[in-house]
Amino acid sequence: QIYDTSCKGVYDRGLFSDLEHVCDDCYNLYRNSYVASACRSNCYSNVVFRQCMEELLLMDEFDKYARAVQIV
């Protein structure tokens, strides 16, 4: 896994892994490369990441992921 240089916070492999899984699962759902790159844009702080969470039924864990995005 390559470190995203758009992320300016703390490098935490576990948090990156959690965020990356959302984007990977979303890509697997849609099989669209735009979804994969847009999900990761701006260090996961974007509307596509949130839409992916909704589509993957992860909104009950939104606060956990929002904190992770703020940290990384």
Swiss-Prot record:
Gene3D superfamilies: Crustacean CHH/MIH/GIH neurohormone (1.10.2010.10). The keyword Secreted applies. It holds the Pfam family Crust_neurohorm. GO terms for molecular function: neuropeptide hormone activity. GO terms for cellular component: extracellular region. Disulfide bonds join C7-C43, C23-C39, C26-C52. One of its GO terms (biological process) is glucose metabolic process. Keywords: Amidation, Carbohydrate metabolism, Disulfide bond, Glucose metabolism, Hormone, Neuropeptide, Pyrrolidone carboxylic acid, Secreted. It is found in: Secreted. Signal peptide: none annotated. The modification Valine amide is found at V72. It comes from the Eukaryota. Produced by the medulla terminalis X-organ in the eyestalks and transported to the sinus gland where they are stored and released. The modification Pyrrolidone carboxylic acid is found at Q1. Its main location: secreted. InterPro entries: Crust_neurhormone_CS (IPR018251), Crust_neurohorm (IPR031098), Crust_neurohorm_sf (IPR035957), Hyperglycemic (IPR001166), Hyperglycemic1 (IPR000346). The N-terminus forms pyrrolidone carboxylic acid in isoform CHH-II and is free in isoform CHH-I. Hormone found in the sinus gland of isopods and decapods which controls the blood sugar level. Has a secretagogue action over the amylase released from the midgut gland. May act as a stress hormone and may be involved in the control of molting and reproduction. Belongs to the arthropod CHH/MIH/GIH/VIH hormone family. This is Crustacean hyperglycemic hormone. The lineage of its organism: Eukaryota, Metazoa, Ecdysozoa, Arthropoda, Crustacea.
